[in-house]
UniProtKB/Swiss-Prot annotation:
PANTHER family: NADH-UBIQUINONE OXIDOREDUCTASE CHAIN 4. The chain crosses the membrane at residues 1-21, 30-50, 87-107, 123-143, 176-196, 223-243, 261-281, 288-308, 316-336, 342-362, 376-396, 422-442, 467-487. It comes from Pseudomonas aeruginosa (strain ATCC 15692 / DSM 22644 / CIP 104116 / JCM 14847 / LMG 12228 / 1C / PRS 101 / PAO1). It catalyses: a quinone + NADH + 5 H(+)(in) = a quinol + NAD(+) + 4 H(+)(out). NDH-1 shuttles electrons from NADH, via FMN and iron-sulfur (Fe-S) centers, to quinones in the respiratory chain. The immediate electron acceptor for the enzyme in this species is believed to be ubiquinone. Couples the redox reaction to proton translocation (for every two electrons transferred, four hydrogen ions are translocated across the cytoplasmic membrane), and thus conserves the redox energy in a proton gradient. This is NADH-quinone oxidoreductase subunit M. Belongs to the complex I subunit 4 family. InterPro entries: NADH_Q_OxRdtase_chainM/4 (IPR010227), NADH_UbQ_OxRdtase (IPR003918), ND/Mrp_TM (IPR001750). The lineage of its organism: Bacteria, Pseudomonadati, Pseudomonadota, Gammaproteobacteria, Pseudomonadales.
Amino acid sequence: MILPWLILIPFIGGFLCWIAEHSSKTLPRWIALLSMTLVLILSLWIWATGDFQLAPAPGGEPEWTLQFKVLWIERLGISIHLAMDGLSLLMVALTGLLGVLSVLCSWNEIQRRIGFFHLNLLWILGGVIGVFLAIDLFLFFFFWEMMLVPMYFLIALWGHSSDDGKKTRIYAATKFFIFTQASGLVMLVAILGLVFVNFNATGVITFDYATLLKTQLSPHVEWLLMLGFFVAFAVKMPVVPVHSWLPDAHAQAPTAGSVDLAGILLKTAAYGLIRFALPLFPNASAEFAPIAMWLGIIGIFYGALLSFAQTDIKRLVAYSSVSHMGFVMIGIYSGSQVALQGVVVQMIAHGLSAAALFILCGQLYERLHTRDMRKMGGLWSRMPYLPAISLFFASASLGLPGTGNFVGEFLILIGAFKVVPVIIVIATFGLVFASVYSLIMIHRAYFGPSQSDEPILGLDARELSMVLGLAVLLVLLGVYPQPVLDISAASMHGVQQWLGAALSTLAGR
């Protein structure tokens, strides 16, 4: 019964925030903070008490540590079916942590419609947790689409317009909504197609994941359905060339919106590929793998090159996310269990480091009222702590040894090298580009001639505790990643069985 509460707490908390807005300005903030802290504590309690070593038998049904199933729409075979394994637990814990931080980082930034802001913020987080727990495909799609509307409001109502005034927050919100909504509808068609193919074979309408895993598909149908899922996940990840919504959404979103977008929403796409696209369509995924990995390579270099050209610090960090998710794409489609576990570490590490960079960008914006790096400069001597902390997270995002990002990228590269050595050699050069754009960001923002002699406020205890906490977690993940690797091993072994068998069959032809 604990799984529904992980989803219900943010929804109930968000509604209470909206009601509390009329009585107090600070009460909605405390309700939101309490709600996400409760989600984080529950997920850590499950981690401490659950057994996550259950690996599925080859060709058998998936194994879950926790399950909750209630029939919802019997005629259509739709259930409220929630399940948790090691992968989904890690993602829910990450959501809880970044949810707490997104509430804290918007504490002073948001000053109007505070209750409605926290309603949207918590409903996004509730929808994300729903995506990570839903196993019924209709329920998964329901939560997938449900995240979009509150995210639209978050950007449209509380976002910032660009410094040149050309791109407004409404433009960014609408572009985000159209891209993700259109791709989601493609996935809906693919889900319905899979359900009808199963219905024609068995005479039973069902959206149950375990049942649909056994559906026999012809090669052409499997390819079409796999592409339907891939398009939706590729847009959300995002994969070049369907990435253009991301920099605009990040640049115009409030800090909490950017933290959620980079830290969690992009991970729902990688999770969707691992949980649904690969196991449901293993043969088509195996044939598609070289294309997907080359798309990952393009993303690594394209994201890095566009990062060089940015003057807006938030757009630079956004394009760096495109580059980092290219490594995730390569790891997912390599079919190597080592690389798949590297993907999990990289998802968590990128969630922590990208969230920290966007929090730091927000702290800069609150003080300087600009995101244009040409108007910064010389901040190293004028601001205590913030420049040094920014340097740490910029170094972490380029894969500094001793941080989680290094472990994730190293596992992806070493695991996939056995399978696709040429692609990995090329991808390694992407790390060189990452070091260049990270150092460009630090140099432009913090060094060089000072643009003003006015004193700048340093970080207060709330701001300092957020980024230092993330730094400690990132170093812990880099120095001792074993708990994360242990808890995700069984889940990744199951995925590797599905895709690995298909890749072996393909190689034997």
